[in-house]
Amino acid sequence: MSADGDHGFTFGYMTLRGEDGSVRLAKYLTYWLRTPQGWRAAAYKRMGRPEGEVSLALMPPSLPAQRLAPNDDSSVVAGHRRTLIAAEQAFSDEAQRIGIGPAFRRNGRDDAVNGGGEAGFTIGAEAISRAVGDGSATSPVSWGADDALVASSGDLGITFGVIRPNGPPPEGRPAAFAFFTIWRRESPDEPWRYVAE
């Protein structure tokens, strides 16, 4: 939840049952905006998940230290948006310099979640960095944000962009694919860190 109470995100597990009796396991991540009509999904991602045990225990909520009134100054929100788009680009640039695993370690939060390829979510920047490429001195991909939404309080936001391989894609893989990343910071004076993807 953002400090202004107007942005939030959820993630979890689902079981999809087809009319033919088939069962598919999945994970989801949703970014929400509060509107006069209620909460509405601004971004939604459903990922398949393999069989396996998953913890259904609730994580502590990712909440701001204090509640703030929404800020109606569009120039302030535009400034927050610019810093968030720049943070996403800096994350990719750092991955090119130090490797994708170390960049995920440096740019994430201890309470970050990643959908990944396991049955459950990977929790924490350290574990996520190991899952995506620990020890790798390079990055197989580069990316950047084309757009972003940011709470008026400047502490929660989401970036949207495209990931591209740094070389020819493996046979049968797309040359580029869309992504979104959810970011949090304690205050507008602090650096952005990814919290969910």
Language-model features, listed with the residues they occupy:
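Short, low-complexity N-terminal intrinsically disordered segments enriched in polar/charged residues
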Residues: 42, 50-106
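Sec-exported extracytoplasmic/periplasmic mature domains
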Residues: 34, 89-97, 109, 113, ...
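A mature extracytoplasmic/lumenal domain signature
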Residues: 12-14, 30, 45-46, 108, ...
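Short beta-strand edge/turn micro-motifs at domain boundaries
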Residues: 25-62, 176-197
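A solvent-exposed, acidic/Ser-Thr-rich amphipathic alpha-helical stretch
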Residues: 1-6, 21, 101-153, 170-174
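Hydrophobic/aromatic beta-strand elements that line small-molecule binding cavities or substrate pockets
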Residues: 1, 13-16, 27-33, 145-150, ...
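Glycine-rich beta-strand-turn "strand-cap" elements at beta-sheet edges
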Residues: 1-3, 43-65, 115, 139-154, ...
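A short, structured loop/turn motif at beta-sheet edges
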Residues: 1-7, 33-38, 150-157, 184-190
